[in-house]
């Protein structure tokens, strides 16, 4: 069994809470956990920066850090930010600046990876695998999935409604 710090477990919990497809009863349990160990924006950013530092140093990584570092490796445009923890903690990433928020982007990669690994919503794993083969790139497939997830999240927020798994899956199927 791999030992994980409270911060790593909390990040996993936050990813699960962000996922619209984790069952409600599980989310209620997770929300109680988050109420006790709710990491700040700085702690989440620190997780990614520390993981990147450990990765570049060749240090031993936890399974979550290994997954995160694989996505970081595929995003050289984020690596300078990840290599500067103090700058990363202070920087604001707003649409007006035209800069992608690397921490949101990487968190979405982790969330989508989790959705695929547990096949939630049911069918996403097959869609992701088919799309990866079609595009000959798991990374590009995740970026297209990310666009669909972002759209469904935006619609739910705009309408003050729950996320619609069917709409999400329907938009993913259109990618095929």
Regions found by a protein language model. Name each.
Residues 6-9:
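Short hydrophobic alpha-helical segments enriched in small aliphatic residues
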Residues 35-100:
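Core of compact, soluble alpha-helical bundle domains
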Residues 78-133:
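Heme-based O2/NO sensor domains and their adjacent alpha-helical segments
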């Amino acid at each position: 069994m791999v030992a994980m710090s409270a911060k790593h477990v909390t990040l996993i919990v936050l990813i699960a809470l962000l996922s619209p497809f984790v069952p409600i009863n599980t989310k209620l349990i997770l929300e109680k956990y988050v109420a006790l160990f709710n990491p700040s924006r700085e702690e989440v950013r620190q997780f990614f920066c520390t993981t990147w530092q450990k990765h570049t140093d060749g240090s031993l990584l936890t399974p979550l850090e290994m997954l995160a570092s694989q996505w970081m490796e595929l995003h050289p445009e984020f690596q300078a930010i990840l290599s500067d923890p103090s700058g990363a903690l202070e920087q604001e990433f707003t649409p007006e600046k035209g800069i992608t928020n690397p921490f949101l982007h990487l968190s979405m990669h982790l969330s989508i990876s989790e959705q695929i690994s547990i096949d939630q919503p049911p069918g996403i794993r097959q869609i992701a695998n088919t799309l990866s083969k079609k595009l000959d790139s798991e990374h590009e497939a995740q970026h297209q999935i990310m666009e669909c997830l972002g759209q469904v999240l935006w619609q739910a927020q705009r309408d003050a409604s729950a996320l619609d798994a069917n709409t999400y899956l329907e938009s993913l199927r259109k990618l095929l």
